[in-house]
Design a protein with these regions (language model features):
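C-terminal interaction segments
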Residues: 149-182
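Structured loops at beta-to-helix junctions and adjacent beta-edge loops in soluble globular domains
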Residues: 99, 139, 165-168
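Short, structural beta-strand-to-alpha-helix junction motif
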Residues: 39, 80-81, 158
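Short, helix-capping/interhelical loops that line the mouth of catalytic, cofactor-
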Residues: 1-60, 64-69
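Short, contiguous, pocket-lining structural segments
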Residues: 42-46, 84-88, 154
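Short, contiguous alpha-helical
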Residues: 1-21, 69-128, 162
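An amphipathic alpha-helical core segment
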Residues: 115-154
Length: 182
């Protein structure tokens, strides 16, 4: 929690410098700047050291703090801090895993039990936010078949490409034009 407070205090002012419209961009910019000189091994070492502490810190956040409202911007709107701690951080790290695998040319080891659960959760929130009917077939180990409403657009796409589309990493048309920032 101490690191998060540091990032808020130092990162939020960076939003003006980088012409950002979302508060989290300043935090990301601060993380990049503070770690730009580190080697890959040093970054990995920091992650090994801090990662478990950060997860424990999430779970130790006092209940009153977990309900403090935070602005996520459209389409998510205002959500309690617990949304960020329980949902947002997990999805963010998972989505960056997709980015890293693509950037390094490594295959992403996907399972229905882990990755499929994340994808299903994302589909459910996405459907609730935009409310447009759809019949969605997501291919691959993290995929599944999802239906929302009746007589909706039929979409067949790889599960990971679906996530990349919702997050703006690739263009979306039709029902896939509704974003869900992760």
């Amino acid at each position: 929690m101490r690191e998060f407070a540091h990032q808020l205090r130092r990162g939020l002012p960076l939003n003006k410098q980088i012409d950002s419209h979302h508060w989290v961009d300043g935090l990301n910019e601060l993380q990049i700047r503070e770690r730009a000189s580190l080697s890959d091994a040093e970054l990995a070492g920091q992650l090994k050291e801090v990662g478990p502490k950060a997860v424990r810190g999430r779970w130790r956040t006092p209940p009153p703090m977990r309900y403090l409202p935070l602005p996520f911007g459209p389409p998510i709107g205002w959500q309690p801090l617990k949304y960020l701690l329980d949902v947002g951080f997990t999805r963010d790290v998972w989505c960056h895993r997709i980015d890293i695998c693509r950037a390094t040319g490594r295959p992403m080891d996907l399972t229905a039990g882990h990755d499929g659960r994340l994808v299903a959760d994302i589909v459910a929130e996405w459907a609730a936010i935009h409310r447009e009917p759809f019949d969605l077939v997501l291919d691959g180990p993290a995929g599944g078949t999802f239906r929302h409403g009746h007589d909706g657009e039929h979409v067949d796409i790889d599960a990971i490409e679906y996530i990349r589309t919702l997050t703006g990493r690739r263009p979306g048309r039709g029902v896939l034009s509704h974003p869900l920032p992760l």
